[in-house]
Amino acid sequence: MSKRNQVSYVRPAEPAFLSRFKERVGYKEGPTVETKKIQPQLPDEDGNHSDKEDEQPQVVVLKKGDLTAEEVMKIKAEIKAAKTDEEPPPADGRIVYRKPVKRSSDEKCSGLTASSKKKKTNEDDVNKQSSVRKNSQKQIKNSSLLSFDSEDENE
């Protein structure tokens, strides 16, 4: 069994006529098994690679309340600062779960207003329409049904 683990493949030398032919044609060797396993260097995942000056979106201010380029840069800086404020993962590699911060009732409903009166009137209209449809269907079914008298059944 130990000899089986020591087996390896040795690639034989390429014949001279093949090497001359490849040289004339300009053949480039493809990836081998060893070169396929090598991982390419990936850029840093900081998000800076897409924030180059020429790759940034164009900022157009149409109205008075629109964001300007300076305001966008401030918001991006705040987001980056918030990301850096997060705690680094623990050294021992354990995942720690924490309860989310509870929001106050003002934050939950900020900007949301709903009137139940409108919903109720819509629901009532839908219910009335469905009940009218059901009644008309019952009348149609009742008229199409055959009825037998009890006298006919006795005979």
Curated annotation (Swiss-Prot):
The modification N6-acetyllysine is found at K108. Signal peptide: none annotated. Keywords: Acetylation, Phosphoprotein. The keyword Phosphoprotein applies. Pfam families: DUF4604. InterPro entries: DUF4604 (IPR027911), KIAA1143-like (IPR040219). Residues 24-63, 80-155 are annotated as: Disordered. Residues 128-147 have a biased composition (Polar residues). The modification Phosphoserine is found at S50, S130, S147, S150. This is Uncharacterized protein KIAA1143 homolog. It comes from Mus musculus. The lineage of its organism: Eukaryota, Metazoa, Chordata, Craniata, Vertebrata.
